[in-house]
Amino acid sequence: NHVCNLYLQNKKLLPTKVIGYKHPGDKVYMSEKMVDMVIPLLKEQKYLNIVEKFNNQTVDVDLDLFRKIPMNFNLDEVRWYFHLTGVHTDLSNPYIEVKNHQKIKDKVVIMRSTRRKNIFINYKFINNYKDILFIGLEEEYLDLKKEIPNLEFYDCKNFLEAAEIIKSSKFFIGNSSFGFTIAEGLKIPRLMESFPEFPVIYPNGGLGYDFYFQVHFEH
């Protein structure tokens, strides 16, 4: 068992060749807002002793070196960090811990990026069910509400609250977005909408399933 300090560097510039790999116009790895959103979640993890913004603290392992490994820059699979630390762990076990949300519980929770939508999939049948909640960006919510008119929206104050809502859900549905990353770490029941152009994200362990076609999504 290890207890580590983690320092997050905000506004670090992306290499010129990969600018916009997350969103058009992105020029940094993590914005200050993104760092502020994720720190409360990371501070809840028992294996992290200190979590704060980087300010020239001593660093033993620079996790940004992951981006210098000779492989596709867009690969977001967490296991590739094993090759930096030399520590291999069982990714079928939970590696994120949070409490249940005090108020929002037993919802079907969705976070779906508009950039990674599967063109073979629609969510219209979900309108037949109740207690469907979207967390994430409002523009993404409005996009999905065209298919699910009774879809509700909640604006989380940070990723810790998002994780608490996901943990308290009936199950989670998402595509390649930070919401699925959280659900994957929690190992709660989850469905992953595979992205045809880059299907590299998939569940490991627990009640996790991915789908590529509509018939499998609905059944």
Q: Model segments located where?
A:
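Catalytic machinery of carbohydrate-active enzymes
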Residues: 1-219
